Amino acid sequence: MQVRTLATITTDTTVDTRVPTQNYQRHPEMVLQVGITGTITVQILGSLDGTTWVEMLAASAASQLSAAALVPHVRIVTTGTSGGTAVVKVGTGQGPRA
C-alpha cells in the first residue's frame, strides 16, 4: 500500500493529486491523509475502469464523501469551518481491503 500525506489544507481550498498510472498499477490501494479545517469532499475524476472505489476510513470533521467517475486523479475540496483530519482510501479492484 502506498501512503501519501498531503499538506494541511484550509477552508474553501481545492487540492488535486494525480497518481501516476504506473504507481497506481503497482499499488492498487492508496491512502491520502489530509489535515483539514473544514468538511471534506473527495472526488474520483475521469475514467479508468469500472472497479475503482473510494472509502472514507476516518474523519473527525468530514461530513461528505462524493465519488464521481473513475480514475487515479483525486480531488480534495474543503468547505465549512470545522477542523480535524480525514483519511481517505482509494483503489482499484473488488473493493476496500483490510
Per-region residue spans from a language model:
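C-terminal interaction-tip segments
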Residues: 1-26, 80-98
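Short, solvent-exposed loop/turn segments in extracellular or other extracytoplasmic domains
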Residues: 12, 58-62
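Noncatalytic modules at the cell exterior or secretory-pathway interfaces
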Residues: 26-32, 68-87
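Exposed aromatic-hydrophobic patches
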Residues: 17-22, 62-69
